[in-house]
Structure formats: structure tokens, C-alpha cells
Swiss-Prot record:
Post-translational modification (record): Methylated by PrmB.
Family: Belongs to the universal ribosomal protein uL3 family.
GO biological process, one term: translation
Protein name (record): Large ribosomal subunit protein uL3
InterPro entries: Ribosomal_uL3 (IPR000597), Ribosomal_uL3_bac/org-type (IPR019927), Ribosomal_uL3_CS (IPR019926), Transl_B-barrel_sf (IPR009000)
Modified residues (N5-methylglutamine): Q153
Role of this protein: One of the primary rRNA binding proteins, it binds directly near the 3'-end of the 23S rRNA, where it nucleates assembly of the 50S subunit.
Molecular-function GO terms, alphabetical: rRNA binding; structural constituent of ribosome
GO cellular component term of the entry, any: cytosolic large ribosomal subunit
Signal peptide start and end residues: none
Highest taxon above the source species: Bacteria
Gene: rplC
Swiss-Prot/TrEMBL keywords: Methylation, Ribonucleoprotein, Ribosomal protein, RNA-binding, rRNA-binding
Length: 216
């Protein structure tokens, strides 16, 4: 249970090490993560911190949410995200506090969650990397079909989970154990080594890695 950040995917670029090695990185804008609520066991049954990211016009905020944000003294955000944390860490924060890129360190391993790019309705070749049929040699109108999807009268049905055509992408994806290559505190940017799911401008959630031995 660790505090994380909400960010916006800016895009990809590369940086160079002192040895001249090229490192592909994804740039994340994590500016203005504002604490809107601190939940405690006494009042909510668990301990967590809620943060707001981005900005939104007041006319686009519902009255209950506007009252919730006004109570915390925080400007309306584009998105609200809750992070489960320990009570000791929650006690160090207060409503209206700003959490920034300095929450992480260079070299730290993080998990990044985003929504993958939607591809629409896709066939089995694109969706599951199936092989296509022969182009010639007697093959007619069966070049990109998946083939048989079942058996005969027994069992007389298609087994659940059979890989077939369908919607591809636009699902929540978490990439684990990515390394923070660089932090630009002035511009409030995180440069994370490797690719991150989602399109440019998409929202992502960055948290300390949970499955790496010795992760900070």
C-alpha cells in the first residue's frame, strides 16, 4: 500500500546515458496531484488518500462533487483517484497538499496502469497472432478465417474461452517493474524506461512496484 501519482502520457522519446547508450522512455506529466480527501479507519473503514489531477470547468462539476472539493479547498480536477496507504503515511498528508514527481526517485521501479488503444473489431490474425491460410494451392476464400471452432455432436458446443474475432484494445493494462530513468522536477515530468499502454494524452496511474525484490 503506497501513495502513487496520476499522470498524463505526453509521448515517447529517448535519452542518452553517460556511456552513450540510447534509452527509450515515455514522458509522463504528473503535475498538480492535489489531495482532496484522507480516509481513515474510523470514518471510512480503511485508510486511503484521494487525489485530484488536471483541471475542469466549474460548470462541468456536479454540486455534490463541488462541495466535496470546496471542503478540501481544492480546485476541480479532471479525474479523482484513490490510493490505499498506511495510516502513518496518511497522517503526514493534509487536504490541499500537492504531491509531485519528487515522490519517486531515479532508478526506482514502478507499476504503470493505463487504458490500451482501442483497435475496434479485429480478426484472429491481428487479435491473437494466428497464421493466415495459404494464398494459393487450392485455398479459396479461406485466407484469413480462423478455421474450425468446435467438434462434432460430442461435445456439441464451442468451449468457453475459444479465441475468436472480437473487440481488440481499450482495456485496462498494468505494466510492472518499469524503471524511472529521469525526473524533471521543474517541469513535473517523469521519464519512464520503456513503453506505457494508452494513447498520447491518456491518463495513467503510477505506483511503486509491488513484485520486485528490493523495490524502493
Amino acid at each position: 500500500m503506497s501513495l502513487g501519482l496520476v499522470g498524463r502520457k505526453v509521448g515517447m522519446t529517448r535519452i542518452f546515458t553517460a556511456e552513450g547508450d540510447s534509452i527509450p522512455v515515455t514522458v509522463l506529466d504528473v503535475s498538480d496531484n492535489r489531495v482532496t480527501q484522507i480516509k481513515t479507519v474510523e470514518t471510512d473503514g480503511y485508510t486511503a488518500v484521494q487525489v485530484a489531477f488536471g483541471s475542469r470547468r466549474a460548470s462541468r462539476v456536479t454540486k455534490p462533487l463541488a462541495g466535496h472539493l470546496a471542503k478540501a479547498g481544492v480546485e476541480a480536477g479532471e479525474i479523482l483517484k484513490e490510493f490505499r496507504i498506511d495510516a502513518a503515511k496518511a497522517a503526514e498528508l493534509s487536504n490541499g497538499a500537492v504531491v509531485g514527481a519528487d515522490l519517486f526517485e531515479v532508478g526506482q521501479k514502478v507499476d504503470v496502469q493505463g487504458v490500451s488503444i482501442g483497435k475496434g473489431y479485429a480478426g484472429t490474425i491481428k487479435r491473437y497472432n494466428f497464421s493466415s491460410g495459404r494464398a494459393t494451392h487450392g485455398n479459396s476464400r479461406s485466407h484469413n478465417v480462423p478455421g474450425s471452432i468446435g467438434m462434432a455432436q460430442d461435445p456439441g458446443r464451442v468451449f468457453p474461452g475459444k479465441r475468436m474475432t472480437g473487440h481488440l484494445g481499450d482495456v485496462t493494462v498494468t505494466v510492472q517493474n518499469l524503471e524511472i530513468a529521469r525526473i524533471d522536477a521543474e517541469r513535473k515530468l517523469l521519464l519512464v524506461k520503456g513503453a506505457i499502454p494508452g494513447a498520447k494524452g491518456g491518463k495513467v496511474f503510477v505506483t511503486p512496484a509491488v513484485k520486485t525484490k528490493g523495490a524502493k
